[in-house]
Amino acid sequence: MATGPRYKVPMRRRREVRTDYHQRLRLLKSGKPRLVARVSNKHVRAQLVTPGPQGDETHAAATSADLDEYGWEAPTGNLPSAYLTGYLAGKRALAAGVEKAVLDIGLNTATPGNKVFAVQEGAIDAGLEIPHNDAVLADWDRNRGVHIAEYAEQLDEPLYSGEFDATNLPDHFDEVLGNLQEDE
């Protein structure tokens, strides 16, 4: 295994494919809080974090499960819920006194229009100042879930099991976004 002077064992979190230390160092050198966006198939998480000597300090956080408080009934792992989670995290960050941040996508691939950038766009629309390129942000119809509603209309059976009808997703998105904006 790791015997001899020419063999270098990577750091534990790098071996576990959890941390890109080169990217983390670049983000920390910026001196701004990080908007940490993490996505899975079921949920989306967004946190505003600053580094500290005893470890990172979280100033504001939101998960897509928090959207239930604002009337979200759709699944929580899709693009519209990622946008709303970023919006909620941005509002909470502004309430905590954080106004600027940089996006930390972790080990996610920087594909234009994906859920990580939807979190960023939601936080920007909430009022956070985050440096970005408009080319990576999804168009507004995609953030609202129009593509999901169009796909659901083509199917013979419902897209989601349960009471929620995916064809109403854009209207539902607008309703929940209105609830988030009223909560100011």
Curated annotation (Swiss-Prot):
Task: List the keywords (alphabetical).
Answer: Ribonucleoprotein, Ribosomal protein, RNA-binding, rRNA-binding
Q: Which GO terms describe its molecular function?
A: 5S rRNA binding; structural constituent of ribosome
Would the keyword Amino-acid biosynthesis turn up in this protein's UniProt record?
A: no
List cellular component terms (GO).
cytosolic large ribosomal subunit
Task: Please give the superkingdom of this protein's source.
Answer: Archaea
**InterPro entries in the record:** Rbsml_uL18_euk
Q: Offer one Pfam family short name for this entry.
A: Ribosomal_L5e
Gene Ontology terms describing biological process: ribosomal large subunit assembly; translation
Per the record, the similarity remark reads: Belongs to the universal ribosomal protein uL18 family.
Q: How does it assemble?
A: Part of the 50S ribosomal subunit. Contacts the 5S and 23S rRNAs.
- Main role? This is one of the proteins that bind and probably mediate the attachment of the 5S RNA into the large ribosomal subunit, where it forms part of the central protuberance.
User: What protein is this chain from?
Assistant: Large ribosomal subunit protein uL18
List the source organism. Answer: Haloferax volcanii (strain ATCC 29605 / DSM 3757 / JCM 8879 / NBRC 14742 / NCIMB 2012 / VKM B-1768 / DS2) (Halobacterium volcanii)
